[in-house]
Amino acid sequence: MKHIPSSRELGYTIIRIALGIVLVVSGYNKLSYALTQNTEHLIQIGSTMGLFGFSSGYLWWGYLAAFTEFFGGIAYILEFLVRLVSLPLICLFIVAIKFHIQKGDPFSVWGFAFICLSICIGVLIAGKGDDKKLEEMK
């Protein structure tokens, strides 16, 4: 019997894929700029880990953030290990939010990271969505 997605399942899928696209583009932009221009931007991104007591390895942290966005986005789009991938993405957005709040930025600056964090938490809870095999058994 062919599975017809519910409107809830379809809505969840659209939100997950949309965030995945945003993450892939954002991560790709960071990586391509670092590979073609210079790595200063990644060092700046990585330096936010100083808020958590890290005093070195900023370039490594910057690359880790960019790779997390890029490959996390691909995983969200392909619906591959979404719960596992959500954990580093949640950490990434917590760091971003803490950075902007500590800088004194208004919600309009860090609100997007808050939305992304909320979606990642939702994906962590929901996983891939409805289990089609269980639905077929009912």
Language-model segment annotations:
Residues 1-37, 59-67, 71-74, 78-138:
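Extended, low-polarity transmembrane helix blocks
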Residues 32-57:
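Membrane-interface interhelical connector segments
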